[in-house]
């Protein structure tokens, strides 16, 4: 994982975990790597990983079973999706609309491009 200098590492780790949950790589109820395992694999201090896990725990995305480890919480996908939708709509989407207006791009243009994107497969 390559880290962005402009965003705290613990938040980047939390984002990566959320992406794994959203894509189904880590399904709800599954055990995730321990703080130590994650720290070793990412080559970061375990305290940084612990901060990520604490953040995600406080949001109800993961939970700790004492002595066993951390697990993806039931409903985690919905929590993540709702949080990311809100962030997208209040931030990124406003910027997209602003650029569309400046560049003269219509909703119909975007709709057409979106349907082409979906029909080709969104994984490209």
Task: Please place each PLM-identified region on the residue numbering.
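Short, cationic-aromatic polyanion-contact patches
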Residues: 10, 34, 70-85
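Beta-hairpin "wing" of winged helix-turn-helix
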Residues: 25-26, 30, 58-67, 71-74
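Residue cluster at the C-terminal edge of the helix-turn-helix DNA-binding motif
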Residues: 41, 58-61, 120
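A short alpha-helical element within helix-turn-helix/winged-helix DNA-binding domains
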Residues: 31-42, 56
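Extreme N-terminal segment that seeds HTH/winged-HTH DNA-binding domains in transcriptional regulators
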Residues: 1-31, 37, 87, 91-123
């Amino acid at each position: 994982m390559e880290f962005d200098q402009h965003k705290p590492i613990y938040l980047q780790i939390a984002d990566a975990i959320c992406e794994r949950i959203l894509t189904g790589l880590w399904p709800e109820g599954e055990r995730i790597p321990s703080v130590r395992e994650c720290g070793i694999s990412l080559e970061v201090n375990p305290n940084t990983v612990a901060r990520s896990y604490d953040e995600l725990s406080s949001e109800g995305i993961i939970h700790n079973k004492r002595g066993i480890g951390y697990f993806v919480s039931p409903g985690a996908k919905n929590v993540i999706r709702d949080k990311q939708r809100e962030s997208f709509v209040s931030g990124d989407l406003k910027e997209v609309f602003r650029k569309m207006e400046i560049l003269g791009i219509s909703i119909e243009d975007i709709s057409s491009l979106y349907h082409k994107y979906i029909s080709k497969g969104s994984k490209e």
